[in-house]
Amino acid sequence: MSRRNWLIWLGAATVLALAWGLPASGALNPYVIQILMYVGINMILTLSLNLVNGYMGEFSVGHAGFMGIGAYVASVLTVAVLPPAWAAPAFPAVLIVGGAAAAVAGLVVSYPSFRTRGDYLAIVTLAFNMIVKSVLENIPALGGPRGYLGMPRLTTLFWVAAWVILTLWILRNLVYSNFGRGITAIREDEVAANLTSVDTRRLKLYAFLISAFFAGVAGGLYAHLLQFINPRSFSILKSTDMLVMVYLGGVGSLTGSLLGAAIFTVLLELLRPLGLWRWVVGPLMLVLLMIFRPQGLMGFKEAGLFKPAPPAPAAAASPWRGP
């Protein structure tokens, strides 16, 4: 293993160790820990949305729908299906099932993307978000518009950090693979990509599935942190917040996704004294970003740590000296 990879794995292990040890040691107060968990959940959401909106160049505005599906499925499992004693040991599996349910919904949404792009796809995904919210509001077993509660507080800083690292690792490997080059080709020119034998339908399908899966996982983490969810938590306003984080950090950038999520989450918390007015900040920031800096802070740029290692230089051939 190269020195660079050793540093990456060492950094990941250090983050996990701190996420495990700091809450137990009492070095951080519960308020700071909760903010860090919200930052991590938003990082997962932003990374997943950036795969579709940034790397593939589509414009999806219904990501909160996937988050809501994952949140409700995971919550039903821990409240109504699993015995209480099994909830904590099964929590990783619960999150995966919630993510898988969201991925199935992503499969449904991916089909309109085969024929529509830009504004038309935005309308389709917006309609999907509204449908999910409406369906959740009209299922009495899920609490209807009043919401669903009773979930155990299983989300910890360690689990959030672990999923952030896993999401980042998987997406980093994907975007620098043939898959990543394929979805980038779709972003640049889908017609040309089709002509060069890129299976655009298959790549779009996979991109939506992966993006929706991680949004569903983030929803499960969110539900078991807040211990209460309602359909309004996954409205178009939540999707707008995700768009702000993506375009603030920068499209087509893993580093930008992390920065955008951290900056926006902390900023909203600092503006808490403004009350309801702080929710104006997200839409306003999105408008200003689209006008003055549509590429975001790190648009199409990446920190060296997340870039693939450069190939080793070929050994120089020894001169031929003849027989």
What kind of region is each of these model predictions?
Residues 1-323:
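Transmembrane alpha-helices and adjacent helix-loop boundaries
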